[in-house]
Curated annotation (Swiss-Prot):
Gene behind this protein: tmk
Name of protein: Thymidylate kinase
Top EC class of this enzyme: transferase
Function: Phosphorylation of dTMP to form dTDP in both de novo and salvage pathways of dTTP synthesis.
UniProt-listed SUPFAM superfamilies: P-loop containing nucleoside triphosphate hydrolases (SSF52540)
Species of provenance: Mycoplasmopsis agalactiae (strain NCTC 10123 / CIP 59.7 / PG2)
Binding site for ATP: 7-14
Family: Belongs to the thymidylate kinase family.
Length: 215
């Protein structure tokens, strides 16, 4: 079972993933799972080096160079982390994945959604998420949270409000391409409320519910 998490910076994805694991372990202490992220990956040296290059404030990358780096990092991540875990029938929780790439590189960076999808399909094989959870906050809310938490720490965080507004709109466009895969959660709620909503909607999802009962 492969679940990805998407949303603007400051939406709380990383915290929510960690807290969701805790809630699921309460229900099933023997749950077999991994938590990973993109760009980079869980204990993947090569992908993490690419992540550092992409996010370095000193990096000056063209959109195509940035896209190719993301794609290379993703392929390594899939080979070394995601596919092995899925073959063992583990629950894979990933903070960002292909939908970030479609929104940021395909739409906002101007490479084209078709090009981004073609590039992605070359490397992901069958590793399409079963479920994608989108934590829904606006660009203004994202900027406020990042400023309050001082999360302006890398090249993408330091982009303008206008850039993040475009990313928000791009995400909505991406979601509309495959709406059945997405669980959209109101990110303005408290963390406990967000978690309760996610857990409720996960167990209402037939694919997740069947996996849970059989593992």
């Amino acid at each position: 079972m492969f679940i990805t998490f998407e949303g603007l910076d400051g939406s709380g994805k990383t915290t929510i993933v960690q807290k969701l694991v805790e809630k699921l372990l309460e229900k099933k202490p023997a749950l077999s799972f991994i938590v990973t992220r993109e760009p980079g990956g869980k204990n993947v040296r090569e992908s993490e080096k690419i992540r550092e290059l992409i996010l370095d404030k000193e990096s000056r990358l063209s959109p195509i160079s940035e896209a190719l780096l993301y794609t290379a990092s993703r392929r390594i991540h899939i080979e070394k982390v995601i596919l092995p875990a899925l073959k063992e029938n583990k629950l894979v929780l990933c903070d960002r994945y292909i939908d970030s790439f479609y929104a940021y590189q395909g739409i906002v960076r101007g490479l084209g959604l078709s090009f981004a999808k073609q590039l992605t399909e070359m490397v992901i094989e069958s590793t399409i998420p079963d479920i994608t959870i989108f934590i829904d906050i606006t660009a203004e809310q994202s900027e406020y949270r990042r400023n309050v938490s001082r999360l302006i720490s890398d090249r993408l965080d330091s982009e303008s409000l206008e850039f993040h507004k475009k990313v928000f709109d791009a995400y909505k466009e991406v979601i509309n391409l495959d709406p059945k895969r997405f669980i959209i959660v109101n990110g303005l709620q408290s963390i406990p409320e967000i978690l309760d909503e996610i857990v409720e909607k996960l167990f209402q999802n037939k694919k997740f519910d069947e996996w849970w009962k059989n593992n």
